[in-house]
UniProtKB/Swiss-Prot annotation:
Pathway: Lipid metabolism; sphingolipid metabolism. It comes from Caenorhabditis elegans. The keyword Lipid metabolism applies. Catalyzes the phosphorylation of ceramide to form ceramide 1-phosphate. C.elegans contain specific sphingoid bases, which are unique or different in structure compared to the sphingoid bases found in other animals. Two examples of these distinctive compounds are: 15-methylhexadecasphinganine and 15-methylhexadecasphing-4-enine. GO terms for cellular component: membrane. One of its GO terms (biological process) is ceramide metabolic process. It comes from the Eukaryota. ATP binds at residues 172-174, 205-209, 240, 277-279, 342, 348, 500-502. GO terms for molecular function: ATP binding; ceramide kinase activity. The active site is at 235 (proton donor/acceptor). The keyword Coiled coil does not apply. This is Ceramide kinase 1.
Length: 549
């Protein structure tokens, strides 16, 4: 592209080269004056500029507006040294540099604008899980040319539909051992600050259910204006955001959320989590890491994936909503016991696990369920006979709500909405289910000994649910769409549920019903297998600091 060209009148006039959709050569390339660039119809074509690196190496930038990619090419007489970035990998462009520490930007207090340099701030995949930011400085030949590119790219990024424009961030100041605010300030805030067109409001929660009530009571004009809700805390805070948004959406749509058979409406907003809790299983499952900067990157660039949700009902009334894991028996008792030792921090779970193992709780009850169409196994061929007396077996016509049932003594009853990756289950708890595959994994473990239970939990941590399903014959696991549990009435303690890290009391004389709602919500995240890690070459970087970062 001509960088500046003397006009016949003696003045300087900026030119921009636009290449049409079908590449042509010679005289068919249009040269459009800077002052008349608004005449360019649509957003197609190629924008080209010859630039320099900080080491004075000549390069060419091509912005392909048809395919939304940037091509950086070293002009050394060969076509070998080229790198291409997608538009959705560009966080922003700035006219000033800023510090980047371990791939995390630091907001400058007094940014100093460079004369002709434009800084491209790209996000990239550092390894198999983590995402980081890198800055590519590009030196144009004139300041006006630099400003034009900056204005054009900034406007383009603001128009990207999937990028959030207005989000509310809820921070639990007690999360992460009281470090949630610091986590947000040091690892997240700068990403949002750099994102063009992103407005965000921070709300510090003051009590339990504060976030849920805030969302439910939000004025209609504010609710319709936001397009994202972000939690900085543990799974409990995210559950508040999820519950509040779903309640608000169903109320506005006139849906009866208390009815398990209702077809629920998907909220218009997306959810994000910055993990600052003890387990952080939801964010670890979606991103395959609990890394704060990675979560911030996916929110800022507008990554999106759909996630299943499970509603919990008692007597035709909604009592809880889950997008993680629901467990009963040993795991529920561990959570209940750990509440007495919150002062110990995350280590309280190990202490309570030891205490619960010694106590070795066993619960007798009835599990009923209906299989997903993706399940190929017939439970009647695998499940042992029911304990007698079984209320369903005694009925001549069985149960019209569920296809299968099992009355037994249980050590574990576990339902996974997502694979459930945690520090204690790094390979995932669920054998089969995915993030949004439209199934629940229902795992039933009958009465087993203390030693067997210790071996069972050790195998879960070492191999994950998928390998455990093949190693332990006591595990009965099925892919279901709905199910229920009712404890026997003669038990003094009906037990509790561990629902997304929060305690849910099991009624003594009534069943709880669990219903799957496939891909009900959208999450700021993407399939980890879609993008390969970026490989660096320090030798080649000497040749081009733009192409080889």
């Amino acid at each position: 592209m001509p960088n500046s060209k003397k006009s016949k009148k003696g003045g300087d006039q900026q030119h921009v080269t636009i290449v049409p959709v079908e590449p042509v050569k010679g005289e068919n390339v249009d040269t459009v004056a800077y002052s008349s660039r608004s005449r360019i119809s649509g957003e197609s074509g190629h924008l080209i500029a010859d630039v320099q690196s900080p080491h004075a190496k000549k390069h060419r930038i091509i912005f392909d507006r048809d395919h939304n990619v940037f091509e950086f090419r070293l002009l050394d007489g060969s076509a070998k040294h080229i790198i291409v970035y997608r538009l959705d990998e560009l966080l922003s462009t700035t006219c000033y540099p800023f510090k980047i520490k371990n791939g995390v930007p630091i907001i400058p207090t007094k940014p100093t604008t460079s004369d002709k340099t434009l800084y491209f701030n790209f996000v990239y995949k550092k390894d198999k899980q983590k995402w980081r930011l890198k800055q590519i400085p590009v030196i144009f030949y004139t300041t006006s040319e630099r400003d034009y590119w900056h204005s054009l790219i900034d406007t383009t990024l603001r128009r990207v539909k999937n990028r959030p424009k207005n989000i509310i961030i809820f921070i639990n100041p007690f999360g992460g051992n009281g470090k949630a605010q610091k986590i947000f300030k040091d690892n997240v805030d700068a990403f949002f600050w750099l994102t063009p067109g992103l407005r965000y409001k921070v709300v510090l929660t003051e009590r339990a259910n504060h976030a849920r009530d805030y969302i439910v009571e939000m004025p209609p004009e504010q609710w319709s204006a936001i397009d994202g809700l972000v939690s900085v805390g543990g799974d409990g805070l995210f559950n508040e955001l999820l519950s509040g948004a779903l309640l608000r959406t169903q109320t506005d749509a006139g849906r009866n959320i208390d009815n398990p058979s209702s077809h629920l409406v998907t909220p218009h907003i997306r959810f994000g989590i910055i993990g600052a809790g003890s387990a952080n299983s939801i964010v670890s499952t979606v991103h395959e890491t609990n890394d704060h900067a990675t979560s911030a990157v996916h929110i800022a660039i507008g990554s999106e994936c759909n996630v299943d949700v499970c509603t919990v009902h008692q007597h035709q009334k909604l009592i809880r909503i889950s997008a993680n894991a629901i467990s009963y028996g040993w795991l529920g008792d561990v959570l209940r016991d750990s509440e007495e030792y919150r002062c110990l921090g995350p280590i309280r779970y190990q202490w309570s696990a030891l205490r619960t193992t010694i106590r070795h709780p066993i619960y007798r009850g009835m599990v009923q369920f209906s299989l997903s169409h993706k399940e190929n196994v017939n439970p009647k061929d695998q499940l042992p006979p029911c304990l007698e007396p079984c209320p369903v077996c005694m009925k001549p016509q069985g149960n019209d709500k569920y296809d299968y049932h099992w009355h037994a003594e249980f050590t574990h009853v576990i339902c996974c909405v997502i694979p459930t990756v945690t520090p204690f289950t790094p390979y995932g708890l669920a054998p089969f289910t995915g993030i949004g595959d439209g199934t629940l994994d229902l795992a039933l473990v009958p009465r087993i000994s203390r030693f067997h239970n210790m071996q069972f939990m050790r195998k879960v941590a070492m191999y994950g649910g998928k390998q455990l399903y093949e190693l332990d014959p006591s595990l009965n696991c099925y892919r279901v769409t709905k199910w229920s549990y009712q404890p026997d009435a003669d038990q003094e303690d009906p037990g509790v549920w561990n629902l997304d890290g929060e305690i849910l009391e099991q009624p003594k004389d009534e069943p709880l019903h669990f219903k799957l709602h496939p891909q009900l919500i959208s999450f700021f995240g993407r399939d980890a297998a879609m993008v390969k890690p970026t490989k660096r070459s320090f030798i080649k970087k000497r040749k081009s600091s733009i192409v080889y970062q």
